[in-house]
UniProtKB/Swiss-Prot annotation:
GO MF, one annotated term: DNA-binding transcription factor activity, RNA polymerase II-specific
InterPro entries noted in UniProt: Zn2-C6_fun-type_DNA-bd_sf, Zn2Cys6_DnaBD
Compositionally biased intervals (Low complexity): 98-109
Source taxonomy: Eukaryota, Fungi, Dikarya, Ascomycota, Pezizomycotina
Gene3D superfamilies: Zn(2)-C6 fungal-type DNA-binding domain
Protein name (Swiss-Prot/TrEMBL): Pyrichalasin H cluster regulator pyiR
Main location: nucleus
Gene this chain is encoded by: pyiR
Subcellular location(s) of the protein: Nucleus
PROSITE patterns named among the record's database cross-references: ZN2_CY6_FUNGAL_2
Biased composition (Basic and acidic residues): 59-69
Length: 611
């Protein structure tokens, strides 16, 4: 029968859990070996007994560890085993003669970080030892103790250590500052681990490792990654917060432009002329006319617009709207007005890209200051109030300002005082482009006529004895400054008529056709009109000679196409009930009589005002 060992020989596992260690006595014949305790045997864990260092003065012998090993005589006999670290082996091989045995130095190093120190030990520490990671007990750090080696030597605690590759070696301190209390060492291979890494704080308070200059030069990338990993691991195991080293961002990163599109005020200090120069370089140019790439892109956009206008205005009928309720009619009318104005602006910007290069070149050569002409043109285009209108016109102004490299424009500049001749006249567009432009233009006229017809029918069905306040609101949220137009439906109607009229006049001035701007005099294309005449329509100036110079279509070809589309045997009005007006052909080819519908609308508004 074994007897219980009465002496105090608790193992590390029981001591860490503060439990009573019950160890069997091997008997009177073998007093040097210790059997494993009952708790370790029951748990199947390794029973390790480390000598209590607190009762030994520093420097008196070395600590020993008892490890249970299997032997033929004793199944779980204990043998005394001495541990030697890699650094001690290296120091022995380098000829360093320590004053104490290697295990004793290791014991002193471990006890110096957790136990009391002698005064001479504190004085022998290097200057940066105060910045080293302190090794407190796990109770002080707030962590639970490890069950197997809570009070073991540092070399056994590899779970809390940091692995560093051979490339990220730590720089060793000078020989004069070497001390047995220093814990930093250069690892011997890539798998060597250590539990304590001395860190040096820079002026910003960041924790960095003292890396050697050669390592930084040869393996800068690997060292940075290893140092970041080391500092990050220290955050999770240490009470002091080590901020992770952030990578440096090159200053050129902040100089990258953040906006590539031209919007109102989006280019900062960049002037409108510089924006036009950039657009000209992107799109390219050809001598005497727009480039082929620009024409192809415009043709593709116009084809898409034609399909969109077909869906917006082709299937709309004022007669069908009159059967709907008032609320649905107003919502549909507001949507159609919005689609019409958007279509007019997009179409105007697109055809301005096709404007011939000789217009601004001629006008600028006849004046003393060509820059003023460019400014006036930009203000003319931007007066519509749409921010996106600033994108397309800029390219056209530059196309005309920078086409001077061609032979034709150079010859024209030599004849600065002469008037424009037939040789400098722009070449007309081809037939596919002409037909696509006229198709979109016809759909826009159709949409404008549909809007006016619906407004006319709404006024005709309204009780005029109730006053203007009973008219429904066709445009929501419209105001001029602090003056709200929601309570003034008559002014809203006038705004819709005026804005649509002005946009159509600008489009006709670029195309060289006259349907609404010239009251139909001289034909739809203006071929029989006197070119020197400066008379215009009610919009003013759209039929002037300047408009003839900037047109992009052949007036005769455009007049022939429009005459075949708009002229029918039976003339009819869009909204009308005026004298001499018929029903018109609803199957297509109606003559657009927009002015008659506008006159009828204003007549109804005047009758509301008198009542």
């Amino acid at each position: 029968m074994h007897r219980f060992n009465p002496r105090r020989s608790a193992c590390d596992r029981c001591r860490g859990h503060k439990l009573r260690c019950i160890r069997l006595d091997p008997g009177p014949n073998d007093t040097g070996a210790l059997l494993p305790c009952k708790r370790c045997v029951k748990a199947g864990a390794e029973c390790i007994h480390t000598a209590n260092l607190s009762v030994k003065p520093p420097g008196d012998g070395h600590h020993s560890a008892h490890r249970a090993t299997e032997s033929p005589g004793h199944p779980a006999a204990f043998q005394q085993e001495t541990r030697v670290s890699d650094r001690q082996l290296r120091e022995s091989s380098l000829g360093i003669s320590p004053t104490q045995p290697a295990p004793q130095r290791q014991t002193q190093r471990w006890s110096s970080s957790s136990g009391p120190h002698r005064p001479e030990d504190r004085e022998s520490l290097p200057p940066w030892h105060m910045f080293a990671t302190p090794m407190f007990s796990r109770q002080q750090l707030g962590f639970s103790k490890l069950p197997s080696h809570a009070n073991g030597p540092p070399d056994d605690r590899t779970a809390d250590g940091f692995e560093v590759g051979s490339e990220a070696a730590l720089a060793a301190p000078p020989g004069s500052e070497r001390s047995p209390h220093r814990t930093s060492r250069a690892p011997s291979d890539g798998t060597t681990t250590f539990s304590l890494v001395d860190k040096v704080f820079d002026l910003d308070g960041r924790a960095v490792c003292p890396l050697s200059g050669s390592v930084l030069q040869e393996n800068a990338g690997i060292v940075t990654a290893a140092a970041s990993t080391t500092v990050t691991s220290a955050q999770t195991h240490h009470m002091l917060p080590f901020s992770q080293v952030e990578p440096l961002t090159p200053s050129s990163y902040f100089n990258v432009p953040t906006c590539s599109t031209l919007t109102t005020g989006g280019a900062g200090s960049q002037s409108l002329r510089d924006q036009q120069m950039q657009q000209h370089q992107r799109h390219g140019s050809a001598s005497g006319r727009s480039s082929a790439a620009t024409q192809d892109s415009c043709l593709q956009l116009l084809s898409q617009l034609s399909s969109k206008f077909l869906m917006d205005f082709g299937k709309s009928s004022a007669g069908d709207w009159s059967k709907m309720a008032n609320n649905n009619t107003n919502n549909h009318l507001s949507t159609t007005i919005s689609n019409l104005f958007d279509g007019l602006q997009i179409f105007l910007k697109t055809i301005e890209c096709l404007r011939p290069a000789t217009f601004l070149e001629n006008s600028s050569s006849d004046s003393e200051c060509s820059y003023s002409d460019l400014c006036d043109e930009s203000e003319f285009v931007g007066s519509t109030g749409d921010n996106q209108m600033q994108v397309y016109p800029g390219a056209m102004a530059v196309d005309h300002a920078h086409e001077g490299s061609s032979t034709e424009n150079s010859a024209h500049r030599r004849g600065r005082g002469a008037s424009p001749t037939a040789d400098a006249a722009p070449q007309p567009l081809d037939m596919p482009m002409t037909l696509t432009i006229l198709t979109c233009y016809t759909w826009l006229l159709k949409g404008y006529e549909v809007v006016l017809s619906e407004i006319y029918q709404m006024l005709a069905s309204q009780d005029r004895h109730q006053g203007l306040q009973t008219l429904p609101t066709i445009v929501q949220g419209v105001g001029i400054g602090g003056f709200k137009l929601e309570d003034h439906p008559d002014m809203q109607i006038e705004i819709v008529i005026h804005v649509g009229w002005q946009l159509l006049q600008r489009i006709e001035g670029l195309l060289g056709v006259r349907v609404v701007s010239d009251e139909g005099r001289g034909g739809l294309g203006g071929s029989s009109r006197d070119e020197s005449s400066t008379e215009g329509g009610d919009g003013g100036g759209a039929g002037s000679s300047a408009s003839d110079e900037r047109r992009i279509l052949d007036p005769r070809a455009a007049a022939a196409v429009l005459d075949s589309w708009f002229t029918t045997t039976t003339r009819g009005g869009s909204g009308g009930s005026g004298p001499g007006e018929g029903t018109g052909d609803s199957n297509g080819g109606r003559t657009v009589e927009i002015k008659g519908t506008i006159a009828n609308i204003r007549k109804y508004l005047r009758s509301y005002g008198r009542n």
